[in-house]
């Protein structure tokens, strides 16, 4: 379960950073999901899934270190199941948002 939680946090973090970079900005150099979400807010990108990540970011952020270094780490199964769903939804949103940008870039390249 430890590795699952770590991988979920990392997947969300990398998806947010990818979204930022693919929209022409530099991501914040931290593992904090809220820092990336704040940057995305400033970029005027909004979606309900981003709010889902924000609502549980205190849980997901803790997984980045606690899952690897805290022997007593024991996540709630409901949190893990919800995180899997949110992570999938986030990745789909990021793919959709960045694919639209890529298509727009192709159209304006000429």
Give the positions of each predicted feature.
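Terminal alpha-helical segments
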Residues: 1-110
């Amino acid at each position: 379960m430890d590795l699952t939680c770590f991988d979920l946090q990392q997947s969300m973090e990398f998806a947010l950073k990818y979204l930022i970079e693919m929209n022409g900005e530099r991501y914040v150099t931290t593992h904090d999901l809220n820092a990336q979400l704040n940057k995305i807010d400033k970029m005027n990108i909004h979606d309900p899934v981003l709010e889902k990540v924000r609502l549980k970011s205190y849980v997901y952020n803790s997984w980045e270190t606690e899952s690897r270094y805290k022997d007593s780490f024991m996540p709630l199964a409901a949190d893990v199941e919800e995180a899997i769903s949110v992570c999938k939804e986030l990745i789909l949103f990021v793919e959709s948002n960045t694919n639209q940008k890529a298509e727009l870039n192709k159209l304006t390249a000429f």
